[in-house]
């Protein structure tokens, strides 16, 4: 054969081989050990994760949910310390609804954020954006030995891209995990701060007075001042529908609810399953005898006692249904 024709045939054949190797339609075989390092990185990426939700144990004070008011008043300013906040009531399943706190102790908020809302708030502050987990394999070539296209082979050779993807997603998972843990801490701290008002004794008032040092209101007070805005400070401050509890309403609370004593307060749970906190203190009822006032003594026992009009005692308002 003529040497010129032989050389031309070799050139043409080489070109055809090169073209066939670079075609996407052709496949190459990859052995067992060729992609050990690459597969290890992919396995590490697939193993990366972050918390996907919250558990019941993440809420350190679940009892607060049963104590949160169902309805709040407009913002009020307490007389004793001049603190602004809100009063609200809880339906214990009795003839009246009981305020969640004593007069003079107010909630700083009317809405409590959930754990999920706290996490979203924190992620917004940190600028965390959603990121999908990188994918470098499919069912066809996820294990080795395998056959893959030449284009897939070239992509798979970029170990640096794999490392970069791993680092980005690993940082994302660590940031998400940190935000999740910080959200739990923030949520519980906020819950504690927002519910401290439940345990406060509040302001002390003389019976029949509309201010902490108003002793003049008792001169012409009726035997029961409940709902009378001239003498009932709960009605005067909170408005229509609110009043000091009568002796009978206190008795109903004592008889029909479960009382659990702690160091300096009671948790009182009604037939509805809802609860209120009653700090250990003396409490006024709305009733008098003509010479003395019926009070409720809540310390080591729960009992009615007679006292003077000028005694500065706590008031736990009620709301009529």
Mark where each language-model region is:
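C-terminal motif of bacterial Sec signal peptides marking the signal peptidase cleavage site
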Residues: 18-20
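Sec-dependent N-terminal signal peptides
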Residues: 6-14
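Short boundary motifs at domain starts and secondary-structure transition points
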Residues: 88-90
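Positively charged n-region of N-terminal signal peptides that target proteins for export
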Residues: 1-5
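C-terminal, surface-exposed recognition/capping segments
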Residues: 22-26, 32, 36-42, 52, ...
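Ser/Thr/Gly/Pro-rich low-complexity, disordered linker/stalk segments of secreted
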Residues: 54-58
């Amino acid at each position: 054969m003529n040497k010129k024709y032989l050389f031309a045939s070799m050139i043409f054949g080489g070109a055809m081989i090169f073209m066939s190797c670079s075609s996407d339609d052709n496949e190459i075989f990859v052995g067992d050990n060729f992609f050990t390092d690459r597969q290890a990185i992919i396995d590490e990426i697939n193993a990366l994760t972050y918390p996907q939700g919250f558990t019941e144990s993440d809420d350190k004070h679940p009892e607060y949910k049963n104590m949160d008011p169902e309805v709040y008043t407009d913002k009020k300013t307490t007389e004793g310390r001049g603190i602004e906040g809100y009063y609200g009531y809880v339906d214990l399943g009795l003839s009246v609804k009981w305020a969640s706190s004593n007069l003079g102790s107010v909630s700083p908020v009317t809405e409590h954020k959930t754990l999920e809302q706290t996490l979203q708030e924190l992620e917004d502050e940190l600028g965390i954006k959603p990121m999908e987990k990188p994918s470098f394999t499919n069912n066809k070539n996820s294990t080795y030995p395998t056959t893959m296209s030449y284009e897939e082979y070239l992509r798979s050779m970029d170990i640096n891209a794999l490392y970069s993807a791993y680092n980005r997603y690993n940082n994302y998972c660590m940031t998400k995990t940190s935000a999740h843990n910080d959200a739990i801490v923030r949520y519980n701290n906020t819950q504690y701060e927002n519910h401290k008002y439940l345990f406060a004794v509040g302001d002390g008032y003389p019976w029949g007075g509309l201010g902490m040092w108003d002793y003049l209101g008792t001169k012409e007070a009726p035997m029961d001042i409940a709902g009378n805005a001239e003498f009932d400070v709960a009605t005067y401050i909170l408005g229509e529908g609110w009043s000091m509890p009568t002796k009978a309403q206190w008795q109903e609370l004592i008889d029909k609810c479960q009382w659990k004593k702690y160091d300096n307060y009671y948790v009182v749970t009604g037939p509805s399953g809802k609860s209120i906190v009653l700090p250990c203190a003396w409490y006024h009822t709305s009733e008098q005898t003509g010479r003395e006032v019926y009070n409720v003594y809540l310390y080591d026992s729960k009992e009615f006692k007679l006292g003077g009009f000028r005694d500065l005692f706590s008031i736990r308002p009620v709301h009529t249904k």
